[in-house]
Amino acid sequence: MYQLPTSINIGGKEFRIRNKGDYRMVLDCMLALEDVELDEVERLTSCLIIFYEDINNYEELEKLPDIEVAAKEMIRFFNLGRDDKPGLKTNYNLIDYEKDEQLICSAVNNVAGLEIRTVPYCHWWTFMGYYMAIGESTLATIVGIRYKIASHQKLEKYEIKFKNENPQYFNMDYRSISDRQLSEEFLREVWNQNK
């Protein structure tokens, strides 16, 4: 309780989280998971290699005693130690961590009271604490409008004006996405594990 985890216990063995769970490493994982040029297996494999400090290539994945648990615990870490994803439940990507970098950092900087990109280390959970404390901001306005567009809600006049004046923030793919469930069956199939 009230600890920032820097390792994951898998089968009684501790596996270090790369860079002690720094937010930049997690954002790299998010980019890997969203990489449309990779298939699902490659996305998950890339993400596990980025996430676990002692896993640096595909062959080293065998060091993990249970790939399924390793993947589930990684996702649990992303979700701030929760089994379910915190925040707004939606079937749409409302944030693009790469394209929205300046907006995200500006809003987080305002909450944190410093330029977050200049600190050598900031744990993912700390970063997300700042992120969840973002109040009224350009980012909040943009995400609110994106949500309305994605869910086919009518925009207010000021939102239409903002959208028309800032089209660069609204050229996203609003098609529905499916939450990738790291199901036992899928992971066994991917990793050829038989239990």
Which stretches of residues belong to each language-model region?
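Structural motif
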Residues: 16-17, 36-43, 61-65, 94-99, ...
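Acidic-enriched, low-complexity/disordered segments with a strong bias for Aspartate over Glutamate
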Residues: 22, 28, 35, 39, ...
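Alpha-helix capping and helix-coil boundary motifs
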Residues: 35-46, 59-67, 155, 176-186, ...
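A glycine-rich, hydrophobic loop/mini-helix early in the fold
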Residues: 45-87
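Alpha-helix initiation and N-capping motif
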Residues: 23-26, 38-45, 64-71, 101, ...
